[in-house]
Amino acid sequence: MSVPRSSGAKAIAKAGQEYRDGDYESAIVTLASATVDENDYLDLAYLLGLCYTRLHRFDEALLYLEQVVTQGAGDTRTLQCRMTLAYIYSMTGRAKLAEYELTKLVESSGESPQVCSALGHASWKQGRLDEGLRWYAKALDLAPENPTALNGYGYLLACAGKDLDMALTCCRKALTEDPGNPAYADSLGWAYFKLGNLDEAGPYLRSAAEALADNEESAAHVQEFERAVRSR
C-alpha cells in the first residue's frame, strides 16, 4: 500500500516546479506556507537556498545552503550547495571562504572544469596569480573549449603580462563561445590593450564597462586605456 505524501512534500514538489519554471518568488511563497516534518526539511532548505541565490538575496540563501551542507550526506545535492556557496562568496568578495568550499568539493568529488576555474578565480582574488593560472590550466586540460576557463586563463595571462598572444587567443575563443558576455569582452579588450593594440581594445573595454556599470575592475581598465590614448 502506498503512503500518502505529506502536505510538506506536496508543497516542495510544487515549489520545485515553480523553480524550474523560473518563478522563484512563487516558489518561496509556496515553501513559506508549507508545514514540513524533519525528513522533508533539507529538501525545503535546499530549494529556498537556490531560490534566494537566483534572486541575489545572498544573506538569506546562505542561511539555508549552509544547513544543507552541514547536515547533508555528501550527495549530489550537497555538492551543488557547496558550489553555490562558493559562487555567493565569490560574488560578495569573500574569496577565502569560496576557496574553502571549492577545496572541499575537490576532496569529495574530484576536480572538474567548473571547480578548477572557480579555484583559479579565488586564488587570483587573494593575490596568488600564478596559482590561479595553474588552476585555469587544469580546467583547460579537462575541457579545452570551456569558455570560463579560456577567459580566466587568458585574462590572468594578460594581467601577468605573460604569453600575450596566448592570452588574446584564449579570450577571443571565450567571447566567440559566449558573445553576449561583457566580462569576456572586457578580458579580450584587456588582452588587446596589453599587446598595445589600442584601436582594437577600445570598443571591447568601453562596451564592457557600460554593461558592467558597477564593476570597479572594468572601469579601471577603461581609465587606463583612456590615459594611454591621451599620451600616445
Residue locations for each model-derived region?
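Residue-level recognition of tetratricopeptide repeat
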Residues: 16, 50, 87, 121, ...
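Canonical tetratricopeptide repeat
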Residues: 47, 84, 118, 152-153, ...
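Short coil turns that delineate tetratricopeptide repeat
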Residues: 39, 73-76, 110, 144, ...
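Position-specific recognition of the canonical hydrophobic site in helix A of tetratricopeptide repeat
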Residues: 19, 53, 90, 124, ...
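TPR alpha-solenoid repeat register
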Residues: 44, 78-81, 115, 149, ...
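Residue-level detector of the short coil/turn that links helix A to helix B
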Residues: 22, 56, 93, 127, ...
